[in-house]
């Protein structure tokens, strides 16, 4: 995945063949914000401008710009995997939640 960072925000970068430009989509926002550029410098400038506009609109409307997360989500897995993970957690003296949290954290390393 191609990512670009500006001021603590990240954007996923892709190529748009219809416009013959690169497209960025800012991640983790409470709303949508994208931008286009023909080269990396232009893309970064447009990223900054798009982010500034988005943040200004959020300030004006009293909206939190970043998505808020509760720390909880549902995960659907096959029953066999659920059983294997439960047994592994028990063998390690951990809760299933702790085992899953470690595995997810390790996937980001």
Residue ranges and their predicted role:
Residues 1-21, 25, 49, 56:
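N-terminal segment of the canonical double-stranded RNA-binding domain
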Residues 12-14, 36, 74-76:
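Generic structural detector for well-ordered beta-strands
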Residues 27-30, 67-69:
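Short glycine-enriched loop/turn motifs at secondary-structure junctions
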Residues 30-41:
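A short, exposed loop/beta-hairpin motif centered on an aromatic-Gly-Thr core
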Residues 39-53:
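A short, charged, amphipathic alpha-helix used as a generic interaction element across diverse proteins
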Residues 60-76, 80, 90-94, 98:
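Short Lys/Arg-rich basic patches
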Residues 96-109:
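Short, basic amphipathic alpha-helical segments that act as recognition/interaction helices
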């Amino acid at each position: 995945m191609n990512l670009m960072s500006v001021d603590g925000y990240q954007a996923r970068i892709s190529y748009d063949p219809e416009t013959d430009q690169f497209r960025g989509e800012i991640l983790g926002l409470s709303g949508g914000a994208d931008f286009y550029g023909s080269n990396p410098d232009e893309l970064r400038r447009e990223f900054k401008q798009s982010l500034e506009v988005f943040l200004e609109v959020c300030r004006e409307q009293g909206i939190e710009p970043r998505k808020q997360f509760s720390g909880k989500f549902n995960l659907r897995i096959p029953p066999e995997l659920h059983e294997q993970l439960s047994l592994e957690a028990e063998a390690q003296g951990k809760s299933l939640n702790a085992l899953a949290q470690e595995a997810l954290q390790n996937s980001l390393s």
